[in-house]
Amino acid sequence: MLYVAKTDCTDPYKNLALEEYLLLNVGDNVILYLWQNKHTVVIGRNQNPWAECRTSLLEEEGGHLARRLSGGGAVYHDLGNQNFTFLCKDEHYDLQKQLSVIQEACRLCGIDATFSGRNDLLADGRKFSGNAFYHSKGFSYHHGTLLIDTDMDRLGRYLSPPKAKLESKGVTSVRSRVVNLKELSPTLTCAKMKEYMTRAFEAVYGQKALLLPVPEEAILLPMAEKYASADWLYGRPIPFNCTIQSQFTWGHLQVLIEVNGGVIENVQVYTDAMDFALAEQLRGALIGIPFRSEELVRAVQALPYGEDLAQMLRAQEL
């Protein structure tokens, strides 16, 4: 069955909780979840909040910081942005089909949208949608933003990605590479885009979508509290002795290492890689081994992107 879930809530922690709840309860169905957050920077599962966002400025101006389950980079949400999430069993997960829904919704408002790179949708050569992905225990979701009429000044002020990441994309600022769809379709609103997304969802999947009732707030409260907690948002800082970082085609990586008696005692990994499991895999591979280049290289070679990681570590001459 196809379902559309909608909410008028604009609290990022409650909305992320609902997203997780839907994933846990999607069953054999495919759900399109449409939602909006008010004045929020949402960072990827493994990102460093202080490196990606001007957190103090965001807080001073009444904004919220949120961290999602999926990997990828930081994005700004306001009520000029429309979020979407496709949720289903792995056997029903079809990225091209899901992207086709977004492209069809854009076509309905006269915009030609194309997929670019690892996770972006472009219109007029500029990004209007960043996408990210999460897979767990046979279920998956694909979610993203749709910039309709977002406050670009705030977007540019709050987001502060590493300089190397921007240089790798050939741009000088976050703002210079994004576009509001309203600029290309002046009568477009978030309300209209929700209608277009629903119509496109039904057209691409070839069946009528039913409206899915949203659970009571009390059911979502424990998950919402997790997403709002300082532990989830910021983690526990470690007294690191060594910082290693590099920019790859698959994302930016920063590794903080705490060494005690010549042995790696703790590791913190920050990355915007789309593979949300990479950070924990890398951390697990490094903790407990001698702090020597050859040992580190040996430990990472079997991991995803192992050769890239090995080359980064060899270059450190530890």
Residue ranges and their predicted role:
Residues 1-93:
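N-terminal lobe of the biotin/lipoate ligase/transferase fold
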Residues 132-133, 146-148, 246, 253-271:
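Short beta-strand elements
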Residues 36-41, 114-125:
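Short, glycine/charge-rich beta-strand/loop segments that flank catalytic centers
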Residues 88-92, 182-187, 270-273:
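A generic structural motif
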Residues 81-119:
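Contiguous, small/hydrophobic- and glycine-enriched helical/loop subdomains that border
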Residues 102, 110, 129, 137-237, ...:
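Long, positively charged amphipathic alpha-helical accessory segments at protein N-termini or as interdomain linkers
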Residues 220-261:
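Acidic, Ser/Thr-rich low-complexity intrinsically disordered segments
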